[in-house]
A protein has these predicted regions:
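Nucleotide/pyrophosphate-binding catalytic subdomain
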Residues: 1-246, 312-319
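Structured beta-strand/turn binding interfaces of compact recognition modules in eukaryotic regulators
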Residues: 25, 57, 368, 381, ...
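Alpha-helical repeat solenoid scaffolds
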Residues: 39, 223-231, 251-255, 259-268
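Short active-site-adjacent structural elements
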Residues: 179-183, 247-252, 419-422
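A glycine-rich phosphate-binding loop feature that marks nucleotide/adenosyl-phosphate handling sites
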Residues: 243-248, 345-348
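Terminal substrate-recognition subdomain of acyl/acetyltransferases
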Residues: 249, 258, 262-318, 328-343, ...
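A conserved beta-strand-loop-helix scaffold within acyl/acetyltransferase catalytic domains
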Residues: 314-389
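Conserved acetyl-CoA-binding loop-helix of GNAT-fold acetyltransferases
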Residues: 389-402
Length: 444
């Protein structure tokens, strides 16, 4: 441990180093040009304060066509040398091998953590080799699973390291990219809130998407690996993307041209918002999914206008907490809601109530009459002040609301409301209500 402490004292760390782990799933599929482009992306990432760590999956040996231990080892070495050479014009990197032992129970044990720590503290990019030594034997093995990435994360989050660095991002770079979406027939899920969406995405992969057996297995394994990762380290942001997207050099901040890794380091957001309507032509299709542990969503929805929710009764039964709901609305809008007056107006006419986490965000949808017909109307959309800058909460609430009211949803906003740009992007139609200060929005 003294070597790590020495290294950290040497460079006098003034702040925690933010690491970004890139798991390269099939290095054997990469061209020299793609490796060079990755070097440029890594250089940009480092200029933004991120410290990249590259983990090479052992699946690259599928192009080796040999079972000989020595041949496999030489093949992996040659692939790592090729990567090192192609990166060398952009960043200083170092291949790390021998950091882990493969125990008899199949688990990886960190033998020399400073083998990863020291290069990071010296401003180098560690490239973790999938070749490990079998404990107690002079034999070597090639790790083909998520276990290697997981061991690297454990090493970087160990007590020795945790004061000096944090793991912020874990990026899976492979041929399949993000999780395919039935709804986005030509693209992938944009932002996945794993607590809320794991089962739905698993169901899509297994039952709803037309995939080859190999593609299905890759997507399922990615989903399960992300769940393992975020269950253990809930504050990490996961990304899944393709080689093409990960090595994009373009700087244009629009849709497909944005490198998703660089964009996420800058903003912690996907390159487009997950609550944008899929059907709109202006919503770009991407091959990247951002994955968060996310936030629990509670949804109370009614099927018909004559079955409006009784919020007071739900509060009495402990199903909801009106005191917390009032605090959320007050804090979000910066004014004191007269709850008694509000409930007199909407109670028993509430079409839906959506609550994110512990009342950190929420939406109240009411049934309103229009020409004798009941329509779902977004009465309140609120996010507490301290979470308003955090990507995703408004998106997650909005997405849950759109899923609950697919047929039709209306809302209005003052014409000078700065949030209107966000609303324009999420509505299918909108128009200015003549002679008033309101603009009406529609989706469905």
């Amino acid at each position: 441990h003294s070597r790590i402490n020495y290294a950290s004292n040497e460079i006098k760390l003034t702040q925690t180093i933010r690491t970004c782990i890139l798991r390269i799933k099939r290095l054997d599929h990469w061209t020299d040009k793609q490796m060079q482009n990755l070097g440029n992306v890594l250089r940009k990432a480092m200029s933004l304060g991120a410290s990249p760590v590259i983990v090479i999956d052992g699946k690259l040996i599928e192009s080796c066509h040999s079972d000989e231990e020595k041949t496999i080892e030489l093949y992996v070495e040659s692939q790592l040398e090729k990567l090192l050479l192609n990166l060398s014009d952009y960043v200083s990197a170092r291949v790390v091998q021998g950091c882990f032992d493969l125990q008899k129970d199949g688990k990886l044990n960190t033998v020399v953590p400073e083998m990863i720590g020291a290069p990071i503290f010296s401003g180098l990019v560690p490239i973790i080799s999938p070749i490990v030594v079998k404990e107690g034997l002079l034999k070597k093995a090639c790790i083909k699973s998520f276990a290697l990435t997981s061991a690297v994360i454990d090493c970087l989050q160990s007590d020795d390291m945790t004061d000096m660095l944090s793991v912020e991002k874990v990026v899976f770079i492979g041929q399949t990219g993000g999780f395919l979406s039935v709804e986005r027939s030509r693209g992938t899920h944009v932002l996945v809130n794993l607590l809320q969406e794991f089962d739905d995405i698993e169901d899509e992969i297994v039952n709803k998407l037309e995939l080859s057996k190999e593609q299905r297995e890759i997507h399922l394994s990615n989903l399960k690996d992300m769940k393992l990762l975020l269950d253990k380290s809930p504050n990490i942001t996961g990304l899944l993307t393709t080689i093409e997207m990960a090595t994009k050099e373009e700087e244009k901040q629009v849709g497909k041209e944005t490198n998703p890794i660089i964009f996420n380091i800058l903003t912690d957001r996907p390159t487009i918002s997950s609550s944008l309507p899929v059907s709109l032509r202006r919503t770009p299709q991407l091959n990247t999914t951002v994955v968060k542990k996310g936030i629990e969503i509670s949804e109370f929805l009614t099927k018909a206008p004559n079955e409006g929710l009784d919020l007071m009764e739900m509060d009495k039964k402990g199903m909801i907490d009106l005191r917390k709901l009032k605090f959320l609305i007050d804090d979000s809008f910066g004014r004191d809601l007269n709850m008694e007056h509000y409930l007199n107006r909407v109670n028993n006419r509430v079409a839906g109530l959506i609550i994110a986490g512990d009342y950190e965000g929420g939406a109240i949808i009411t049934w309103e009459k229009a020409e004798g017909k009941s329509v779902a109307y977004l009465d309140k959309l609120a996010v507490i002040k301290e979470k308003q800058g955090i990507p995703g909460i408004a998106d997650i609430v909005f997405k849950a609301m759109l899923n609950g009211f697919r047929e039709e949803l209306l809302w209005r906003s003052r014409k000078n409301n700065p949030v209107n740009k966000w609303y324009f992007e999420r509505s299918k139609a909108n128009y200015s209500i003549g002679g008033t200060q309101w603009r009406l929005f529609y989706t469905g």
